[in-house]
């Protein structure tokens, strides 16, 4: 991904039970994505029509944060068709957790086996982790898709999503 990226994960983990740095191995019970379930099951059981994989990337020395090594000002919008069902997969190639948030639509998190697990607005992706979720593009317009660590968002870890 070029100069905007200072590391890349070859074998990302797919586990959802990692509480994150500083909380592992302390003997505490920590709520993780693996513990969460949405009552009633998957609100939209359709299979995804397409897959989008985005790498969470950055260069800590240069304080650049990006998706696929591309900062917001150099990126193109992601286009979703109205009512399309998609699978978005994040691969975190950085040393930090990133709480990723898509405005206007829900993120239906999948377990490592691909089964629906929980509906969320913000999905935390731990370092060296791969997390997939399904999205139903049911909100027309232009939407923000960004890291909720606002300084990461401001430094480029942001994409525009267009549903049209």
Predicted regions and their residues:
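Copper-binding active sites and cupredoxin-like electron-transfer domains
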Residues: 1-164
């Amino acid at each position: 991904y070029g100069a905007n990226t200072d590391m890349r994960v070859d074998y990302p983990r797919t586990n959802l039970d990692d509480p994150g740095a500083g909380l592992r191995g302390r003997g505490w019970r920590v709520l993780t994505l693996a513990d969460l379930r949405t009552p009633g099951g998957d609100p939209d059981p359709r299979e995804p029509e397409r897959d989008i994989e985005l790498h969470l990337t950055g260069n800590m020395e240069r304080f650049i944060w990006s998706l696929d090594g591309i900062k917001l000002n150099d990126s193109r919008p992601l286009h979703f068709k109205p009512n399309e069902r998609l699978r978005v997969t994040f691969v975190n190639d950085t040393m930090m957790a990133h709480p990723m948030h898509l405005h206007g639509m829900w993120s239906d998190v999948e377990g490592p086996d691909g089964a629906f697990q929980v509906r969320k607005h913000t999905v935390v992706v731990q370092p060296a982790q791969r997390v997939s979720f399904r999205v139903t593009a049911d909100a027309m317009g232009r939407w923000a898709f960004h890291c909720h660590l606002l300084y990461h968002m401001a430094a480029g870890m942001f994409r525009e999503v267009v549903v049209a």
